[in-house]
Every structure is written in C-alpha cells, then in structure tokens.
C-alpha cells in the first residue's frame, strides 16, 4: 500500500504518457480513471494494455492525491471519471458525500476470490483491491523485552523512545483509538479518559512524524526505538537499521485498505464493473505483488517468502487484522485533532 507516499500534480493525462503507450485511435468510448499517478509503466503493462483488449476503449487518467481528486469529483457532482482509487478514509468521505454508486456484487465475479474483509469494507460500495496494516515496529537490538502488545507503548522503559504518526496522517487517529483501548473505554464515547491515556504516553514520545521518510530518519539516527507505522515503511526502516522488527501483537494489527469505486456520474458503468473485476483477478494481483506495486488481496496469489516479506499477505496474517469504522473516526477527527494538539503542543 503506497498511496500515502506519492502525491502527483493533479492533471488529466493520456495513456500515451504511461510507458510510451501508443496514442488511442478510433475507440468509441473514453474510460476515465482517477488515480494517484505512481508506477505508471507497471500499471500500463499489467493493467491498462491488457484491459484495452477487453474494453476496446481509450483510457485517460485524472491524477493527484486523495483529497484533491475527491474534491474535484465533488465539485463536478460525481461526474468526469468512471472509477476512482482512494485510501479507505477518503473513500468513506466520498460515500458520505454521495459521490459513488452502490455496487452490484454479482457483476464482479472475482470478488469471491478476495479476502472477505475486502469485499465490502464500507458497506454497499466499492471493494478493496489491496491491503496493508498499521502496527508497531521496534529495534530488537535495543528493546528488551520485545514488543508484544499495543499496551507496551506505555512501558516505563520506553521513555523518550517512541514515535507516533501525526494526528492528521492516515495512521494518526488510530493512535487515539489504541489509547482509548488502553484506558478501557470507547474512544468515540469517552474522549476525556482516552486523552488522559494519550497524555500518559507523552513522556515516551520523542516526536510525532508526518511522513515515512521522516520516520526512517528518526530510526536511522537512533532517536527512536519504537514506532507506530504502516507496513510499507518497514523495508526502508530495515535498510537503515537491520534490527528493526515488526512486532507480533497479541491484539493484532489494524487493517488499512485502498478501495476502488464507481463514481455516481460514470458514463461507462458496465466498463467500470469489468475494470474492477479485472484488477481483482489473480493474474493482475500476482503481477502487481511480484513487482512491488501493491499487496495482493486475491487469495489465490502465491508468493515466495522473499516476495511476501514486504506485504500483508496470507490468510493467517490477514485474518488477524481488525477493521476500524471510518464513519465514526471521520466524525470524531476534528475534536481529536484539537485535543491531540493540546497534548503535544504543550
């Protein structure tokens, strides 16, 4: 899952800009995909060129970060693109804004091949096409005993050793959720006790990070020995410090997914269903995983241990993940941001 790491200039680009593909000729339809804009050559080879043979259509892209693309779709009242790739928190916003069509799962045969948590992660709307996780990483050479629980973040021996994601990042609000669980309360219902737990954690926190590269720098300089992180940062952290280890938490990690939805103003709904079905297929998912693009959500994908080590992969690992309610989290986020800043702004 790499969406959060790549922010491209928001623009509509033709297929010709992706890997030098030939200019579309006399196709009768134009199929528009809203997408981040990274790994263009691989997407062209693995998805676009093969799908063109199915759709006999011209394919164009609107690229940019989650917020920009969703805002453009909202300003156009759901028109202008056929399908839109988004991270789960932003697709929840799109659902609440009425930007997407409800999904008829019978039109996506490959849904039966993906992990159950990805089939309808946000109710009646689009499926997940890749999966990741948020958990804890630690330097096994410096942290003893090992990290085995979310509650270990509050351990006295980890004073000035921890880094948390900033509250406005993808994983930041999940730190608040874990603080509520540590306090034994529902973080949505009892913010007072939840943020007392956040306050109690403050002495262990060296710095809150806002980007993966910032976290890697904190790890490489030795300032941080434990961090809450998304799994896509692990390889970079291990390149900096070989002993950085993904913790096996008794409560499990938190699932993150990227979704694909059909915009409510799509002019090519049948093609949109075919496209979604295509990217969920075993063949496409296998190539994307092997080439380091996205973690597979299709259960039939087979990876070697070396290929799998960078991904959230396999029934056991996926089965241990917990999903969060983005509708609740998005509703609480404004208050959480204010209270978080009160704690860490002191």
Q: Where are the predicted features?
A:
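Mature extracytoplasmic/periplasmic domains
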Residues: 263-321
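A ligand-binding cleft/hinge motif common to bilobed small-molecule-binding domains
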Residues: 89-93, 220-221, 225-243
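A bilobed periplasmic-binding-protein/Venus flytrap-type ligand-binding module shared by bacterial periplasmic
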Residues: 135-142, 178-181, 257-269, 287-288
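Sec/Tat signal peptide C-region and signal peptidase I cleavage site
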Residues: 20-26
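Periplasmic-binding protein-like
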Residues: 132, 196-201, 209, 240-264
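Extracellular/periplasmic bilobal clamshell ligand-binding domains
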Residues: 305-346
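Early extracytoplasmic/lumenal segment of secretory-pathway proteins
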Residues: 27-93
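Extracytoplasmic ligand-binding site segments that recognize negatively charged/polar headgroups
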Residues: 38-44, 80-81, 85-223
């Amino acid at each position: 899952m790499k969406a959060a790491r790549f922010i491209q200039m928001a623009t509509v680009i033709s297929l010709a800009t992706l890997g030098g593909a030939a200019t579309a000729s006399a196709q009768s339809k134009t199929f528009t995909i809203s997408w981040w804009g990274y790994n263009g050559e691989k997407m062209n080879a693995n998805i676009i060129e093969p799908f063109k043979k199915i759709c006999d259509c011209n394919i164009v892209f609107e690229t940019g970060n989650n917020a920009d693309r969703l805002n453009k779709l909202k300003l156009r009242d759901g028109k202008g693109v056929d399908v839109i790739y988004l991270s789960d928190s932003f697709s929840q916003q799109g659902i609440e804004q009425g930007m997407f069509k409800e999904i008829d799962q019978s039109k996506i045969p490959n849904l039966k091949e993906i992990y159950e948590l990805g089939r309808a992660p946000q109710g009646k709307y689009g499926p997940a096409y890749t999966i990741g996780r948020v958990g804890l990483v630690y330097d096994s050479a410096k942290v003893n005993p090992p990290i085995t629980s979310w509650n270990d973040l509050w351990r006295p021996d980890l004073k000035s050793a921890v880094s948390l994601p900033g509250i406005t990042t993808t994983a930041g609000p999940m730190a608040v959720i874990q603080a509520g669980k540590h306090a034994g309360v529902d973080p949505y219902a009892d913010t007072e006790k939840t943020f007392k737990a956040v306050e109690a954690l403050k002495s262990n926190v060296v710095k809150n990070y806002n980007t993966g590269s910032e976290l890697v720098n904190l790890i490489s300089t030795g300032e941080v020995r434990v961090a809450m992180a998304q799994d896509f940062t692990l390889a970079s952290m291990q390149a900096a410090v070989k002993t950085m280890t993904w913790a096996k938490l008794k409560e499990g990690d938190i699932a993150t997914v990227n979704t694909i939805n059909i915009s409510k103003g799509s002019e090519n709904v049948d093609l949109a269903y075919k496209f979604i079905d295509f990217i969920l297929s075993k063949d496409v998912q296998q190539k994307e995983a092997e080439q380091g693009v996205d973690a597979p959500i299709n259960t039939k994908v087979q990876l070697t241990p070396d290929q799998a080590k960078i991904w959230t992969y396999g029934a056991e690992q996926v089965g241990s993940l917990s999903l969060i309610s983005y509708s609740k989290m998005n509703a609480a986020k404004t208050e959480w941001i204010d209270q978080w800043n009160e704690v860490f702004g002191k």
